[in-house]
Amino acid sequence: MVDLTHQVLPQSIAEGSYYLQQSVTQFPRGTVFLAVVDPGVGSSRKAIAATAGGYFFVAPDNGLLSEVLSQLGGLEEAVELELPADASNTFHGRDVFAPAAGKLAAGAELSRLGRTLPDLVASTGRTTIFREGQLEVTVLTIDHFGNVIFDFPARRGWEQLQPGNKFLIRGKRITFWPTYSRVLLGESLLLWNSSEYLELAVRNGNAAEEWGVKVGERVLIEALW
């Protein structure tokens, strides 16, 4: 059993989705992922178990799995988990999700855990907006170093993001480079992080503090011609 993280901000479905997406392929097929970011606990949202790409997932049906399922080629099968009569109204992670994950890890068939679902709730809040020479993104997460990761993977493509090109963020100029070492200590830059997501960083510094941004905020990046 591997404990991936407990550092996802409370109720931040998008941040939880990002970490799940980055982690899944580091594990062998057949791995069961228990993922609980559940601001809707006790509501009508479904508790689910699903499979894609040879992996299994147990989670609330609130969009948390959307990105990782898409990454793995799409949903293959999903079921709605039944709530035990004595389940807490506020702690489904303990009373619903964890037991289901344990059953899957012990070899239970997914189809025996509940009734089949044709589809799942799609994620919301990770919408990138393109305009002429502009990119509006959301802060997905801020890592231990204070690096700011945006909801924009390299595969989406934006031709302006080339080494040496300059941009404007909140009135400040910044340059896109491939590595931290291309700038002086304390200087900011844009780059692709190790997961190929757009990152705002400060060399040997804390970009989140320097730029005053928080998880969930929208940020406008303007290309300077």
Where are the regions a protein language model picked out?
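Structural motif
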Residues: 1-2, 31-34, 47-49, 54-58, ...
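Active-site histidine-anchored catalytic micro-motif
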Residues: 3, 7-22, 26-37, 42-95
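Fold-independent oxyanion-binding glycine-rich loops
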Residues: 4-6, 36-39, 52-53, 60-62, ...
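Generic secondary-structure signature for well-ordered alpha-helical cores
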Residues: 25, 29, 70-74, 102-110, ...
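Anionic-ligand-binding alpha/beta catalytic cores of soluble enzymes and soluble regulatory domains
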Residues: 88-151, 156-161
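A conserved acidic, glycine/proline-rich C-terminal tail/linker
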Residues: 149-212
